[in-house]
Amino acid sequence: MSTNPNPWSPYDSYNDCSQGICNIYCPQWCYLIFPPPPPSFFLDDDSSSSSSSFSPLLIALIGILTSALILVSYYTLISKYCHRHHQTSSSETLNLNHNGEGFFSSTQRISTNGDGLNESMIKSITVYKYKSGDGFVDGSDCSVCLSEFEENESLRLLPKCNHAFHLPCIDTWLKSHSNCPLCRAFVTGVNNPTASVGQNVSVVVANQSNSAHQTGSVSEINLNLAGYESQTGDFDSVVVIEDLEIGSRNSDARSELQLPEERRETKDEDSLPIRRSVSLNSGVVVSIADVLREIEDEEGESGGVGTSQRREEGEDGDGKTIPPTEANQRSGGVSGFFVRSLSTGRFIFSRYDRGRNYRLPL
């Protein structure tokens, strides 16, 4: 039996692949042995835990909760600030109501433009001390601030509708409005309209002559009420002034030149009483006594020198001289009353004086 001298020699020299020996000639019998893979259960736990802790659903939930928390915090801060501001404003309003003065001091008395009233007219409206049992005021609360009236509290009482309001509330309203905030009635009747408006209402009457040929002269009336009409609303004020002193003084001279029918009509005109027509919501009243006093003062100062001399001489509107008789027929015996409507700004005359020649100031 033959033996291999070197049993541990490699089998590289063998070319027979049927023996199942791995060599370079028989690579199909060669196997690569890979190292065993690491245990997989540790990696699965880590990956599952990381994926579960950062899932998109959890991220979305966290974002929603954070946004809701921010919105709630913002709303809380805004509500607290607004509530504090409202309490401060309410306390200041109550303090001003107790003091009875209002928001406007003497340094804030300015005139307002538009439809509102000026400060002097607002201050002239009646101030009333509230008493709960007298029943003089309709209601027990202010319609502007919706707060209850307190006993002996100063309220401003509107003249036409008798609605009462707190001083600061109604003063602020009347700065930009001329009517009642509750019933929309115009605030027209005040206690002292001529002083509150602050306009110079001057009545200038022409000097009257003592001549027997003069039958009357035109009373020139200058009413400086341009600003009054725009500030106090629609005032249907009618002022009627009738000068009967001149008519009574010259009625005899005129009666000699007229026919019996004209004398009868003239007698009816001369017997008319002194009238003063003022609408109910008027703010301006010109007294007849004041007009007569102005006539006497003007006569005493200038001694009858003025527009009456031109009327006495019979001077026409075009500069021509006409006879006294014709001048008497034009002017008439009784100087007619003069009507001026503040709401329309037009000048109208009575039915007795439509045909007379008047010279109105420009």
Swiss-Prot record:
Gene3D superfamilies, A to Z: Zinc/RING finger domain, C3HC4 (zinc finger)
Entry keyword set: Membrane, Metal-binding, Transferase, Transmembrane, Transmembrane helix, Ubl conjugation pathway, Zinc, Zinc-finger
Regions that span the bilayer: 58-78
Pfam families per UniProt: zf-RING_2
Regions of biased composition (Basic and acidic residues) lie at 309-319
Q: What is its EC number?
A: 2.3.2.27
Tell me what this protein is called. Answer: RING-H2 finger protein ATL52
Per the record, the pathway is: Protein modification; protein ubiquitination
Expressing tissues? Expressed in flowers.
Q: Name one GO cellular component term.
A: membrane
What membrane topology is annotated for this entry? Single-pass membrane protein
Query: What PANTHER family does its record include?
Result: RING-H2 FINGER PROTEIN ATL16 (PTHR46913), RING-TYPE E3 UBIQUITIN TRANSFERASE (PTHR46913:SF22)
Q: What is the lineage of its organism?
A: Eukaryota, Viridiplantae, Streptophyta, Embryophyta, Tracheophyta
Gene Ontology molecular function: any one: zinc ion binding
What InterPro entries is this protein classified in? ATL1/ATL16-like, Znf_RING, Znf_RING/FYVE/PHD
- Which transformation does this protein catalyse, written as a reaction? S-ubiquitinyl-[E2 ubiquitin-conjugating enzyme]-L-cysteine + [acceptor protein]-L-lysine = [E2 ubiquitin-conjugating enzyme]-L-cysteine + N(6)-ubiquitinyl-[acceptor protein]-L-lysine
Q: Cite the PROSITE patterns for this sequence.
A: ZF_RING_2
The entry sums up its family as follows:
Belongs to the RING-type zinc finger family. ATL subfamily.
Q: Note what the entry says on domains.
A: The RING-type zinc finger domain mediates binding to an E2 ubiquitin-conjugating enzyme.
User: What are the boundaries of the RING-type zinc fingers?
Assistant: 142-184
Which cellular compartments is it found in?
Membrane
* Annotated source species: Arabidopsis thaliana
Any GO BP: protein ubiquitination
